[in-house]
Amino acid sequence: YDEALEVLSNPDIADETVSAKINEITSIKASLVNYEGDIKHIFFHSLIVFPEMIFKDKTTPMGGYNAGFSEKAEFEKMLPQLYERGYVLYDLNECYEKVNGIMTRKEILLPPGKQPLILSVDDVAYAYGNGYAQKLMVNDDGILVNLVKNPSGEIVEMIDGDVFGVLDLFVQEHPDFSYKGHKGTLALTGYQGAFGFSLDTEEGQAEIIKTADALRAQGWNFASHSYTHNSKNFFGANSNPANIQYDTNKWIEKVAPYIGQTRLFIAPFGYRVKQPGLQYILDAGFEIYCTVSHEIINELYDDYALMSRIEIGGYSMTYYTKLLNENFFNVDEVFDADSRPPVI
């Protein structure tokens, strides 16, 4: 609102219409209230576009994609319900700031009845692409699209081939679902490239930069999801400070040059790195640390903020229906059990 008022205050454009708009915006701004409740954060993996390509056997219980992924059709059913419940897509960066070196929660000023929703998407490497997108790129017409193999084996361009395009189309119809045009956060790894492109070739790097710029223009920002995404020796029981330092430096060296610096760290597997390894992450400039939980957690420490994320996929829609029903959407109206095998 402040930015709009600043633009409209230019005497060169002053007239009755502009004056009325200034009064309207001033009135709206005065009505905003500080949201003081829990900040909720949901996350997705790539959307399953063609479930029939992944779930060929619907009788044998299955984890993997079935557990951790949502289908495109399911995501499209979630959005109207999130909107109707008063959620507003909010920038994770706008939730916290350091004041005199101490991490604090910022005021979150929203219209009455609205609450912030943080949305993030993990990985986006598109390493396999069977039933979901293979690439995210800017096409020859300058449009951000996914390349998706359809059941006929054809590679087709889809504007709505993943979270980004589906969400963008929804926000175009419901602009008040987004605060200041923000959409969400992409949590990028590096070991498999980014957006379906290699980080090790000039051609791949150029495509990654173009895609990142297009995403940023659509209201997305970026987080480190670690470079290795490795639970064995890095983000798991065998984690050690030397490996955390290696992984952190590797992400900054290999990924950050093409998508930009960030202060957001979204831990792989939701693993909470302990000291002294955590210090390498904090010293690298990451100030907001996100885990995974089926509880809503917002915690402040002197030098960082901790926030839990709730995964939205087959597992949570099967085993955590109460949590999702109470907070986000009606699972029975969203979950497509007919297209999936039983979830384990």
Model-inferred region functions:
Residues D38-A214, Q218:
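Active-site beta->alpha N-cap acidic-glycine motif
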Residues N93-N100, A187-G190, S226-T228, I266-Y271, ...:
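Short, solvent-exposed turn/loop segments enriched in Gly/Ser/Thr/Pro and often Arg
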Residues A212, R216-N230:
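Aromatic- and acid-rich polysaccharide-binding/catalytic face
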Residues S31-L92, T104-L119, Y128-G131, A217, ...:
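C-terminal active-site subregion of NodB/CE4 polysaccharide deacetylases
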Residues F195-G196, S231-F235:
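A short acidic, helix-capping loop that chelates divalent metal ions and anchors anionic groups
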Residues Y1-K29:
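Beta-rich interaction/scaffold domains
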Residues T185-A187, A223, Y289-C290:
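Structural detector of well-ordered beta-strand residues that form the stable sheet scaffold
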